[in-house]
């Protein structure tokens, strides 16, 4: 980007600039080999249905240590390029004014143009290796590969093992049954692909499901002012008009395979769609400072958040084998938020600052994905999606804006203390703490697909005995990824050339997967997370310092669970880290 500079014109300031940025995200090599073990369970599978998932792999229930029985089931190679280029230009004009000694400020207006071009290109190659079309060319290219003892025509695992691999305590050794004592060798996997890549079939389905490109032209113009009424009141009103013009291209197909493992050719076409919208976004800020040690701030703002790019890509994916349709267009609206904030700050220059604030947000136009039956004469009538009437009775999945608003409200307390004015041991103490309490509410819209008896059915007639029905239901819960409690505290001490800090960060559990089923068996959330860190620093000279950092020294983990059973879904241990160096 380039700032063209500030220009003084008749007592006003004109600022202008232009910019360009480019981001390429490449995944040039993603090769996966899946080895399987036939019938490893030594217990009746039905008897394991109510066991916690992490106990099913116990040696009492499964035998998986005979490496000779493993065989190569499938091989997948993926590469991906996501590219985004942005051009921008902006212009601001600022003119100060002074009506009297007690009323002064400035007026400011301007605009910005931003053009975004983005595209996603994927490539997928795949082969089932337990079928003749897979293992025959492989053994022809690599005749010395070890065969599986399970079936002599299959490819075994032994030639792919990393002989230098040493297993550590998996997840702090809490789930001993999940420890893996062997791993695949990356070089062996790479060599396998280099030799046999012609045996991998190109999967067209992935390109149709994922690839897209698009262009967004965004214009914004604003006018605002800052008006000071003496030293005690500052009023900042303003408004911005935000206009977006979007055009996206993707692919549609009418005979798409039901998964990404088939290399069938099928007809597809380029699909284009466009949309535009504009919104007025006002903002009002008021600052009141009745005395030197109190600051009161009130604010009302309106903001927007645009939908995910992938949901804007125009696609009509018809999968006749499973009677399903996946549909999307560029007609989604951005999420709009009305924000109210109140902030009270109390100063004491010798000892610190205390702030208490409250906030309230009301958000509409959240985007969600609906899956429902395709039914004539309803909101999922085939003609509304330009799909064949023959798909009626099938299933369609498509994104849309929620008809319900979400709310978020909370209180935040912030305290910062220091005692440098004291003449005792407390002089070096530095303390800070932040507590945020939040409450959110969201209505999650869900369609229940069911079948009811057809009153017009007669044996031998043309009517079917049951009819598909869409029933709408709303589940109330928290906003996704929104904690109800955040707490951060830091305690430090400074003495001459030494400085030390110890800090703790706490986050309450959050909702990560909302309810879709009536029994709520799909709801997932995270456990509360606490992280401790420590930093030490010693100043050697005016230019050099010795420092040491200890991160997450209590080895806290990030845990995700299924609420109805409390069973873990995902557990991540980040471990602890220590750093020592010069600065």
What kind of region is each of these model predictions?
Residues 20-40, 117-133, 203, 246-255, ...:
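Outer-membrane beta-barrel and related beta-rich outer-membrane complex signature
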Residues 18-24, 81, 85-87, 95-97, ...:
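Transmembrane beta-strands of outer-membrane beta-barrel pores
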Residues 42-73, 134-210, 374-401, 458-474:
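Flexible glycine-rich, low-complexity coil/linker segments exposed to the extracellular/periplasmic environment
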Residues 4-13, 97-107, 122, 229-233, ...:
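Short loop/turn motifs that connect adjacent beta-strands in outer-membrane beta-barrel proteins
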Residues 131, 135, 364, 505-516, ...:
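C-terminal beta-signal and adjacent terminal beta-strands/loops
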Residues 214-216, 275, 304-363, 382-418, ...:
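Outer-membrane beta-barrel signature, preferentially recognizing the C-terminal barrel domain
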Residues 360-362, 379-514:
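Gram-negative outer-membrane beta-barrel transporters
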Residues 10-16, 105-111, 235-239, 282, ...:
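Transmembrane beta-strands of outer-membrane beta-barrel proteins
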